[in-house]
Amino acid sequence: MEQTNKIDELLEKTCYVIGVFPEQVKPDAGGQYFDIEYYLLNSEKHFSLKDRFVNVILKLMCYHHVSIQWKGWIDRPSPQTVEKAISKIMGNHSGWLNILLPEEDTLVVFEWDCLNLSVYNPSENVQSIMQKIAVSEGLFWRKSEVNET
């Protein structure tokens, strides 16, 4: 219950994202965002996307203590558990994975229908490493336009 309360608290904090786009696509952009999003999430391309997000989380686990919310809380999950959870979520087209960095008071959220990972309340230390990890996976790190505090 304590970790659930912590998640609720962190979801109200400043949010950053690691994603495939360098900035939020505006509703009036005139492009084909929804077609592209659907394609990336529902074609064979979703395997590449899954691999990138798994790699981000695994790399993060090298630098920080991590607990995940997957069928209960798992402290210091194995790399296989992380990959299995994300694969199952993407395969089912349903669900999310909460990744808590308890010593940093930071929350990373993976949702099956998003082209990004949301990172709530990252310290400067977490921001620095996440930006480098994002670049290493061909992704972008930016402050979210949502949840600004």
Question: Can you describe what each PLM-predicted range is?
Answer:
Residues 1-116, 121-149:
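Structured alpha/beta or helical-core interaction and ligand-binding surfaces enriched in interleaved
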